[in-house]
Amino acid sequence: MRTSNSFSTIGDVNEIQIVDNVTQLEIVDLSFIPRFGVKGELAEAWLATQSIAVPDFPNSWCFLSKGGIIARLGTNEFLIEDRTIAPQLITACKSPPAKVYPVLRQDLVIALIGFQVNELLLQTCSFNFQALSITENPVILTSMAGVNVTVIPGVLQEQPFYRIWCDCTFGAYLLQTLNAIISELNGGAIAVKTLL
């Protein structure tokens, strides 16, 4: 049974499955999953008109009703990641109402999975993720290797699983830095398979 912070698959819509067996630490590029961002005083109300339930608290996330996730970044900003809903919201927000502002999301999106994730985080980030209660579905805005990131910790296949978003202009640097550390920890890259 899936707990509130446990992903059934990477995309949580049974479309994406891990191909390789996870070793102690793996990295995967999830930038191909469509994203949509919106902010503003009436963003929450506008999302409600689109039948999107939002997390109750700032800096938290929840699953969407049909898969995917929505993160509440602060009070009035939201990040939606889903293969179906995100493109629909992009279209619906081409002419947004007053006090609703679309946010272009061109992030590099990666995930870290494996029992050595915390070891990597200790080397790259000053935030203590071990102190979190992931059952509360936290969204953490911090820096990793000097790059501002948004992080959602969770569990996938009974292992720590961290989704990480960063500005794409810093993506190559962050990937290079993380891959070097992952290599030192005897980890590697993992493949994903999209099921049609």
PLM feature segments, named:
Residues M1-L196:
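Basic, glycine/lysine-rich polyanion-binding surfaces/domains
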